């Protein structure tokens, strides 16, 4: 089927962003591959006549596909051959999620970034994917890869999706960046039959030792910035996540924890013994009852 790209301009008073969002959401409910981008502008309804680098690139890659800028991030139809410690950590959970998702399933990737996971799942398993990311540059990269994307706040995107509209909702190491992440996870369980949540375990023994010995938060490949330069972070542990799940079930939210995968501090070797202390990365499957 044909793909649709809707581009809204923030100051357009005739075809407002909210009206354009409604068009895209309606198309998505009908099972169409529809994407939404929003361009900041001050020229009202004439904004599209002025153009911008982002607008021009979005239109170009929608029709032509990958451009030189995006080729630098191209994964060549598979997970890239990673060599650095940073790259290994960046994609560690992708491989687990790939094992869990079945062919032809509907997948919603929240905080999808450049769309590499959805691109891979589309090419290898023919999934019907939709990404959500607030970053316009990353959303345009999704367009270049042929991945349907909704450039929007995650809460807004979830609120406008019907119940059980996806087989999987993916949180790939971005839950800690959300305000009130517990409520967002529960909303994802309304939209999806299964939810995959991956996160950094901040009770990992090296983190504890670093704080005990140096009295400072850790700085590494995953968190390279000092506290004053970093974004919103809700740091939590494996034990705290399982407590959230248990409390939510007591409160009447019908879901169960399915599969769990824990990686040691290198994010490669598996960890089964005392994961709250020894695991650096956790990936959970939540299943709606």
Residue positions per predicted region:
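A short SAM/SAH-binding and catalytic strip from SAM-dependent methyltransferases
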Residues: 168-179
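Conserved alpha/beta-hydrolase "acid-adjacent" motif
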Residues: 14-19
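S-adenosyl-L-methionine-dependent methyltransferase catalytic module, highlighting the catalytic core
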Residues: 182-190, 194-288
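Catalytic active-site module of serine/aspartate enzymes centered on a nucleophile-bearing elbow/loop
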Residues: 35-74
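Class I SAM-dependent methyltransferase SAM/SAH-binding core
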Residues: 116, 120-157
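Class I SAM-dependent methyltransferase "Motif I" SAM/SAH-binding loop
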Residues: 111-113
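Short beta-strand/loop motif that positions the catalytic acidic residue
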Residues: 6-8
């Amino acid at each position: 089927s044909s793909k649709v790209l809707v581009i809204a301009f923030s100051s357009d008073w005739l075809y407002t962003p909210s009206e354009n969002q409604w068009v895209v959401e309606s198309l998505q409910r009908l099972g169409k591959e529809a994407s939404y981008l929003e361009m900041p502008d001050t020229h009202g309804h004439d904004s599209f006549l002025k153009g911008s680098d982002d607008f021009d690139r979005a239109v170009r890659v929608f029709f032509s596909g990958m451009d030189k800028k995006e080729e630098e991030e191209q994964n060549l139809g598979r997970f890239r051959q990673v060599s650095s410690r940073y790259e290994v950590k960046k994609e560690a959970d992708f491989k687990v999620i790939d094992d869990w998702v079945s062919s032809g399933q509907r997948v919603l990737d929240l905080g999808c970034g450049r769309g590499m996971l959805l691109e891979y799942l589309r090419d290898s398993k023919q999934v019907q994917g939709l990404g959500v990311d607030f970053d316009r540059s990353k959303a345009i990269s999704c367009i270049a890869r042929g991945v349907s994307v909704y450039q929007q706040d995650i809460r807004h995107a979830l609120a406008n999706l019907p119940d059980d509209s996806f087989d999987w909702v993916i949180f790939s190491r971005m839950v800690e960046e959300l305000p009130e992440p517990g409520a967002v996870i529960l909303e994802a369980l309304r939209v999806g039959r299964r939810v995959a949540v991956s996160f950094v375990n901040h009770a990992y023994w090296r983190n504890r030792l670093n704080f005990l010995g140096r009295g400072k938060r850790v700085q590494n490949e995953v968190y390279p910035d000092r506290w004053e330069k970093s974004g919103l972070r809700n740091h939590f542990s494996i034990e705290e996540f399982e407590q959230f799940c248990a409390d939510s079930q007591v409160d009447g939210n019908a879901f169960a924890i399915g599969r769990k995968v824990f990686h040691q501090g290198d994010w490669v070797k598996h960890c089964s013994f005392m994961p709250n202390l020894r695991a650096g990365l956790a990936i959970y499957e939540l299943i709606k009852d």
